[in-house]
Amino acid sequence: MQPEYLPKREGLYDPEFEHDACGVGFVAHLKGNASHDIVQKGLTLLANLEHRGAVGAEKNSGDGAGILTQMPDKFLRRVLKEDGIDLPEFGHYGVGVVFLPKDPQAYAECKTIVEDCIEELGQEFIAWRKVPTANESLGETVKAIEPYVHQVIVKRNPELEDAEAFERKLFVIRK
């Protein structure tokens, strides 16, 4: 049953695909070309959203926000090379963002669970990358529960027949 407040189906719009989202914006190149300009426009869009979801009692304790980009292969190669890590060719690795607890024991356990899952699904764990963050402007409420933000790098098993099979493995790892 479709709520009455939604418009009727027309053209590419179909109300069947509606779901609640607060403060969502999209910036993309129609042909899918990646560029720094698209990222800059996305950051501008994000900065101009007055309300991106939940807002806490502290003016600087919101819900957090970010942007989703295409795989930044050149950037990842550069920053991981600084740590002595060489990536496989583009399309033969995946990157996931993981929020980890600050408690040392829970932190180690969570990393082990992720690494074990990767191995169980026949893929190869390459490395963890700690994502630089700047929390100076966060309120004390948020700082108290702020997680570590890491990226996990996964190498595609060469026996997988194609990129779609790898994407399916990454999907299961993510869950």
What spans do the regions from the language model cover?
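N-terminal segments that mediate ammonia production and transfer
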Residues: 1-175
